[in-house]
């Protein structure tokens, strides 16, 4: 087993005792940091940064040099799998990700390959190995993937969407085609996350960014069912240590009980869910991650500290809380406000751990 100097993130996910509440930030390697912008400029574009193991490692480590974070997260993108399936990923200025060959029908689904994580996605595994080597056991490394439903939204819509009418048309008019796509994606994500674990990821997270646009029944059928399949297929032990799994559905606060039944170790919460209520509902089964509104980081540090104190008090005494934002950090947040947030979590949380 590789020794970890700081394992409180992994311990909290498994609801084991910790000295203070661990904290990391979604998108902690990102555009709010001037050093990230410099490295991205050096890479040329976003996907070139993702595909260069040394530069991906550099941006992964940048926030850890600034802040005493309790975990590193692989620098990559959720759309690596659709890109490896041959959909022609590109980024339009001001538009976000786009695909040149979106999935429009069952015939398109039938043609999609299941990518080999050590071949078409080998650059991700190289990044994982490089980051693990450079972390030198300081903190654990989180691997991740998008959920099948969230990946499918981009693949069918051809990019980002506000109304999701194209994929919902497929869901209601040709559900068989969508289920075939989701099944193929679930197999791909399982292989991808297991490869990340074998390459050195010590915990994995599934981001279901768009699950919250579904009705409860559709969420069960088209999103949660496939995340459950992935959880069932994941390696849960590696390098002599349990590998915790976190599910995060943005807008999924009403479905926490169903999510906790998947066998995952933790649930991510967005900022619209009350953490005290979430703990009452599912805290006996899973750890909870979250859940400060990312926009709170625009506030003065004293206000940020008040919000941290409120969320810590909401969760209360005992184990099973990883502090995070309710979604990714915004690109124009002052870096010193992120620092005040991390410092406040550690300082104010000690009283909740005996």
Swiss-Prot record:
It is an enzyme of class 4 (lyase). Its EC number is 4.1.1.37. PROSITE patterns: UROD_1 (PS00906), UROD_2 (PS00907). Pathway: Porphyrin-containing compound metabolism; protoporphyrin-IX biosynthesis; coproporphyrinogen-III from 5-aminolevulinate: step 4/4. The record marks 77 as: Transition state stabilizer. GO terms for molecular function: uroporphyrinogen decarboxylase activity. It is found in: Cytoplasm. Substrate binds at residues 27-31, 46, 77, 154, 209, 327. GO terms for cellular component: cytosol. One of its GO terms (biological process) is protoporphyrinogen IX biosynthetic process from glutamate. Keywords: Cytoplasm, Decarboxylase, Lyase, Porphyrin biosynthesis. Pfam families: URO-D. It catalyses: uroporphyrinogen III + 4 H(+) = coproporphyrinogen III + 4 CO2. Its main location: cytoplasm. Catalyzes the decarboxylation of four acetate groups of uroporphyrinogen-III to yield coproporphyrinogen-III. Homodimer. Belongs to the uroporphyrinogen decarboxylase family. This is Uroporphyrinogen decarboxylase. The gene is hemE.
């Amino acid at each position: 087993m590789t020794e970890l100097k700081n394992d409180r993130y992994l311990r909290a996910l498994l609801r084991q005792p910790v000295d203070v509440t661990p904290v990391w930030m979604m998108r902690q390697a990102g555009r709010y940091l001037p050093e990230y912008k410099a490295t991205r400029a050096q890479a040329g574009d976003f996907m070139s940064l993702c595909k260069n193991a040394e530069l991906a490692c550099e941006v992964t480590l940048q926030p850890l040099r600034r802040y005493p974070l309790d975990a590193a997260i692989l620098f990559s993108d959720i759309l690596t799998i659709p890109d490896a399936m041959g959909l022609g990923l590109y980024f339009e200025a001001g538009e976000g990700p786009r695909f040149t060959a979106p999935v429009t029908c069952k015939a398109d689904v039938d043609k999609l390959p299941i990518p080999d994580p050590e071949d078409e996605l080998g650059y991700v595994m190289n990044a994982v190995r490089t980051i693990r080597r450079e972390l030198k056991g300081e903190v654990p490394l989180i691997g991740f993937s998008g959920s099948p439903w969230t990946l499918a939204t981009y693949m069918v819509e051809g990019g980002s969407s506000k109304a999701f009418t194209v994929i919902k048309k497929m869901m209601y008019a040709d559900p068989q085609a969508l289920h075939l796509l989701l099944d193929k994606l679930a197999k791909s994500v399982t292989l991808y996350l297991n490869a990340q674990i074998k390459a050195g990821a010590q915990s994995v997270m599934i981001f279901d960014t768009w699950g919250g646009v579904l009705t409860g029944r559709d969420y069960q059928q088209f999103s949660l069912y496939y995340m459950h399949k992935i959880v069932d297929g994941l390696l849960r032990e590696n390098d002599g240590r349990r590998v915790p799994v976190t599910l995060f559905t943005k807008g999924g606060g009403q479905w926490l009980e169903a999510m906790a039944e998947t066998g995952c170790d933790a649930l991510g919460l967005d900022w619209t869910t009350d953490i005290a209520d979430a703990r009452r509902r599912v805290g006996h089964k899973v750890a909870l991650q979250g859940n400060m509104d990312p926009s709170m980081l625009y506030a003065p540090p004293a206000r940020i500290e008040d919000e941290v104190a409120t969320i810590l008090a909401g969760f209360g005494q005992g184990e099973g809380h990883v502090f995070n934002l309710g979604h990714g950090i915004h690109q124009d947040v002052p870096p010193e406000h992120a620092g005040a947030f991390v410092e406040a979590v550690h300082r104010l949380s000690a009283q909740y751990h005996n």
